[in-house]
Amino acid sequence: MLAGAGRRGLPRAGHLCWLLCAFTLKLCEAEAPVREEKLSVSTSTSPCWLAEEFVVTEECTPCSNFQIKTTPECGSTGYVEKITCSSSKRNEFKSCRSALLEQHLFWKFEGVVVAVALVFACLVIVRQRQLDRKALEKVRKQIESI
C-alpha cells in the first residue's frame, strides 16, 4: 500500500480532489440561475452604447465632486465622456480612462520595478561579498595547514 494511502488504496489527496470537484460543481449549479436573473435585469436598463454605435460628443474629462457623487459612471475611473448613441439618439455618459491617468500609472509601475530591481541588486552584491569572504577564509586555512 502507498504511504499516506487511505483504507481503499486511494491516496488522501485523491479524496480531497474528489471533494473539491464535487463542491465546485455544486457551487456552479447553485449560482447558474442567479447569474441568468442578473443578466436579464441588467439588459433591460443597459446603456445604449453597449448595443449601438455611438459618437463621442465630449472627450474624456475628469469628474467634478458633484458628478462623482451622483453619476455612477464616474465611480470606477473618475473620468467620463459624453456620448450620443446613433440609433436611439440618447445622450449618456460613459466611463473612460484618461491618457494622463494611464501615463501616471505607467510611471508609478516603472518606479516600483526599478526600486525592486535595486533592492535585489544590493542583495546580490551583499551575498557575493559574503561568499567571497568564505572562499578566502577557506583558502587561508588551507594555506595555513600546509
Curated annotation (Swiss-Prot):
Compartments (UniProt record): Membrane; Mitochondrion; Cytoplasm; Cytoplasm, Cytoskeleton, Microtubule organizing center, Centrosome
Q: Which residues cross the membrane?
A: 106-126
Question: Its topology with respect to the membrane?
Answer: Single-pass type I membrane protein
What keywords is this UniProt entry annotated with? Apoptosis, Cell cycle, Cell division, Cytoplasm, Cytoskeleton, Membrane, Mitochondrion, Mitosis, Signal, Transmembrane, Transmembrane helix
Keyword Cell cycle among record annotations = yes
A Gene Ontology molecular function term for this protein is:
protein kinase binding
Q: How is it modified after translation?
A: Undergoes N-terminal proteolytic processing, removing a peptide of about 1 kDa from the N-terminus of the protein.
> What superkingdom heads the lineage?
Eukaryota
Q: How does it assemble?
A: Interacts with AURKA, AURKB, BIRC5 and INCENP. May be a component of the CPC at least composed of BIRC5/survivin, CDCA8/borealin, INCENP and AURKB/Aurora-B.
- Family membership, please give it: Belongs to the JTB family.
Query: What name has this protein been given in UniProt?
Result: Protein JTB
